[in-house]
Amino acid sequence: MGSRALLLLKVALPLKHQIKCLNYTKITPASELLTKRRFSIKATNGSSLQPPDVSRLAETARISLNQNEVEEFAPKIRQVIDWFGQLQAVDLNSVEPAIRADSEGENLRDDVPETFSEREAIIAAVPSYEKPYVKVPKVLNKE
């Protein structure tokens, strides 16, 4: 049983570039299924999202900014908005939806029943025991 990791390499690209498409290529070495992502880069004019008014944004966040700070933060906020625009441009049609991020593959151990030799010690350690059940506090907030 092995673990999976995603290695991301940061490439210095101008802000006007965005990911055009994202494809998956399956590689099967030693009966393990690995996923390799390939993407192509395409120059664009930036995000279709409109950058917010920094003064109004600061007021909404209940922070005070002077005019110099507004001028300093405006390009940085536009850059973040452009990054969100790049995310919107990613083609996800070739990606199968997943319920959880780790739902691909089987990462569970074998379900093998075990017999505990110190049963009485375990029962003595729990706060509430009603034969044959161990009572635990309510976990879900169902009423």
Swiss-Prot record:
Keywords: ATP-binding, Chloroplast, Ligase, Mitochondrion, Nucleotide-binding, Plastid, Protein biosynthesis
E.C. numbers: 6.3.5.-
Protein biosynthesis among keywords: yes
Compartment(s) where it occurs, according to its Swiss-Prot or TrEMBL record: Mitochondrion; Plastid, Chloroplast
Covalent S-S links between cysteines: none
GO BP terms, alphabetized: glutaminyl-tRNAGln biosynthesis via transamidation; mitochondrial translation; regulation of translational fidelity
Record-linked Gene3D superfamilies: Glu-tRNAGln amidotransferase C subunit, N-terminal domain (1.10.20.60)
Keyword Plastid belongs to the record: yes
Pfam families, A to Z: GatC (PF02686)
Enzyme class: ligase
InterPro entries associated with the record: Asp/Glu-ADT_sf_sub_c, GatC
GO MF terms held by the record: ATP binding; glutaminyl-tRNA synthase (glutamine-hydrolyzing) activity
Assembly and oligomerization: Subunit of the heterotrimeric GatCAB amidotransferase (AdT) complex, composed of A, B and C subunits.
NCBIfam families: gatC
Family per similarity comment: Belongs to the GatC family.
Protein name, per record: Glutamyl-tRNA(Gln) amidotransferase subunit C, chloroplastic/mitochondrial
Species annotation: Ricinus communis (Castor bean)
